[in-house]
Amino acid sequence: MLKRSLLFLTVLLLLFSFSSITNEVSASSSFDKGKYKKGDDASYFEPTGPYLMVNVTGVDGKGNELLSPHYVEFPIKPGTTLTKEKIEYYVEWALDATAYKEFRVVELDTSAKIEVTYYDKNKKKEETKSFPITEKGFVVPDLSEHIKNPGFNLITKVVIEKK
């Protein structure tokens, strides 16, 4: 009887210990690791390749600050066109990260632009390129020759209103 109880407990313990391992494996494999690289913190994943960092301050029509969300990074691909409409869409996502479905974008600041800074291997110096935000947009350049993870930064004020 004692041998049978010990055998039963051993089998039961083995089942529970293996179930926790298989759950961790299946949970970690459901995350698409190809698009992100792990940062210093285990819960932080940085996009691999080019990304658009949206860091905006939401103001009303009079310039009073309404919302200052955290920055949000969106993976983008070289060769794609970033239009004003698409950028406003990303800005609204950044606003939603702080105040979900509370605000909508009215307009971007007229001086808003997207900048990327990288070390140019050919010129052997640091370069900063600026891209104006227009209806036609601009094509995201391929900077993989110079930098692996170029960050295209949008840091501006944006006029917003409650939905």
Swiss-Prot record:
Disulfide topology: none
UniProt keyword Signal present: yes
Keyword flag Signal: yes
Domain of life of the organism encoding this protein: Bacteria
Location of this chain's protein in the cell: Secreted
This protein's GO CC annotations: extracellular region
Any one Pfam family match given in the protein's UniProt record, by short name: Staphylokinase
Signal sequence segment: 1-27
Family matches, as InterPro entries: SAK (IPR004093), SAK/SK_sf (IPR036120)
Keywords: Plasminogen activation, Secreted, Signal
Family listed: Belongs to the staphylokinase family.
Function recorded in the entry: Potent plasminogen activator that converts plasminogen into plasmin. It forms a 1:1 complex with plasmin, which in turn activates other plasminogen molecules.
Protein name as annotated: Staphylokinase
Name of the gene encoding the protein in the UniProt record: sak
